[in-house]
Amino acid sequence: MLKLIIPTIMLLPLTWLSKTHMIWINTTTHSLIISSIPLLFLNQTNSNLYSYSLLFSSDPLSTPLLMLTTWLLPLMIMASQHHLSNEPPSRKKLYLTMLISLQISLIMTFTATELIMFYILFETTLIPTLVIITRWGNQPERLNAGTYFLFYTLVGSLPLLIALIHTYNTLGSLNIVLLTLTARELTDSWSNSLMWLAYTMAFMVKMPLYGLHLWLPKAHVEAPIAGSMVLAAVLLKLGGYGMMRLIPILNPLTKHMAYPFIMLSLWGMIMTSSICLRQTDLKSLIAYSSVSHMALVVAAILIQTPWSFTGATTLMIAHGLTSSLLFCLANSNYERTHSRIMILSQGLQTLLPLMALWWLLASLTNLALPPTINLLGELSVLMAMFSWSNITILLTGLNMLITTLYSLYMFTTTQRGTPTHHTNNMKPSFTRENTLMLMHLSPILLLSLNPSIIAGFAY
């Protein structure tokens, strides 16, 4: 794993030692090269799962998430260039340092084998994200958003720390492999139920589960572009990853405890999709759509069948790329119109025809059109839910319908209609932006040719 961690750490001196006009080129090139390293981890067979080291190892669940994390850093750097064009060089370097340190802690979180180390790194990701949101956001409300983000996550995570210490006292080890192999059966007593809640609550806040999701729209709306991208694409997946790691340790109690949470996520999925239909703020709409997509993942993980785990992993990767792409598109609109209100940016199709193509493709991937991996993930989860209970098909089917509606609503309000007066002197789309959109879309479409590499343990 060091062959991935050390080059990423070396991005820090590269950033600070580069000349001012070379910062973007150097960091983008270096981070693109780093993003090819996780591809080496793909050819592991299931037999030598933990073959790396005692501290860091990768397996079929963490490798796709590592690929997503490393692929996202060059894209974030490319997306931030216009946003930081008026900042002094030291401020640009500090911003990049925050992104890189976030990347390092994410890589180490996805590969940690000790649960306490996983917990510490899980919390470490808060600090750079908080700095990015509260320092580089656009509106004064960003401080409020930062407080929400910090307190929701910390209050959710404290019970997890206590539960981990309790487990360590009783079992003497917190190695994930050992715990999975030697886990005691948890009976459904009050104390065990509370421990189950303590274990899962941190991840449910992070996912976020409906009801614990209020920090997400605030944080997304106020964050700068790179903050929104990494928050939607990778930080939400930390919750799913943690749940998939820890749920097998908590059996058979999960079978009893999962019902209210599955119901809540199915209900929340429809509620947040419906909320999307009456949003006027573009970034807020994309944030709520993230909540509804991740609700499916929560339900899938709690069912605990191989198919639902496959669907959850695929859906996490697909959603990471799609929502990041949507935030990039929203940001390109924001940089031109200086407003997030959708109606004010209507009729952009006539002014930026190529951007309209990216908008169309992004909307279609968001509503899970074949042959994208979004469809594969949703179908796997749908079938797993259906075999768990037939009635769920009504809720998931309704959710698919509403998702289609709000995706097309988002597309038509921003692209169709008559252009408003303040969009007359608009800049054309830059090559950098088109490349950025293409680099988001190409993995979504290409992975549909060989989806087994992001399907997790089932393959």
From Swiss-Prot:
- Please report a single Pfam family linked to this protein: Proton_antipo_M
* UniProt KW keywords: Electron transport, Membrane, Mitochondrion, Mitochondrion inner membrane, NAD, Respiratory chain, Translocase, Transmembrane, Transmembrane helix, Transport, Ubiquinone
Q: Name one GO molecular function term.
A: ubiquinone binding
Q: What family does the database annotate?
A: Belongs to the complex I subunit 4 family.
Q: What is this protein called?
A: NADH-ubiquinone oxidoreductase chain 4
Q: Which Enzyme Commission number(s) are on file for it?
A: 7.1.1.2
The organism of origin for this protein: Pongo abelii (Sumatran orangutan)
Parts of the chain that traverse the membrane: 20-42, 60-80, 94-110, 113-133, 145-165, 196-216, 224-244, 257-277, 284-303, 308-330, 341-361, 391-411, 437-457
GO BP annotation list: electron transport coupled proton transport; mitochondrial electron transport, NADH to ubiquinone; mitochondrial respiratory chain complex I assembly
Where does the record locate the signal sequence feature? none
Membrane topology per record: Multi-pass membrane protein
Q: Which PANTHER family match?
A: NADH-UBIQUINONE OXIDOREDUCTASE CHAIN 4
One GO cellular component term:
respiratory chain complex I
